């Protein structure tokens, strides 16, 4: 498992990691990817946009997320959260740089990746991106803060190969 404490506040403690990994591994497949609603958005890139202007990924089904919720609650007993992102990326899928500035909070991204994929971020458009690779065939946790005004956490995702489950939790510590 890989952890990235981007905001410096610590990454929420994960309990039952093996159980969560097992469940996300079942989702990170070609068969699941092809069964979900695939979406693509395209337009003129805008780094300051709250949501990615250009995106390609699949939305994980509501039934799967409802069934996954009790496990997420068991895995993260020290936080209260709401799920704000539930996507499966396939080979070549990505979302471009955006801020999520319309929903400021602390955010935990949980990923399970079967291939080469990454999350990149920066705090200023003048800075280079800091790329954080996903742990292959395992879990990656990233904790960071979203703000409604600068400095933003500009971020994007690339899935070069394999499949990448991404679950976003807006959270507060208990």
Please provide the spans of the model-predicted regions.
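Non-heme Fe(II)/2-oxoglutarate
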Residues: 1-78
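Intrinsically disordered, low-complexity segments enriched in small/polar residues
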Residues: 6-8, 41, 83, 90, ...
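Intrinsically disordered, low-complexity boundary segments flanking structured domains
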Residues: 66-76, 109, 130-131, 156
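Catalytic core of non-heme Fe(II) oxygenases with the double-stranded beta-helix
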Residues: 79-151
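Ligand-binding loop in jelly-roll beta-barrel domains
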Residues: 149-166
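Conserved SAM-binding loop
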Residues: 167-171
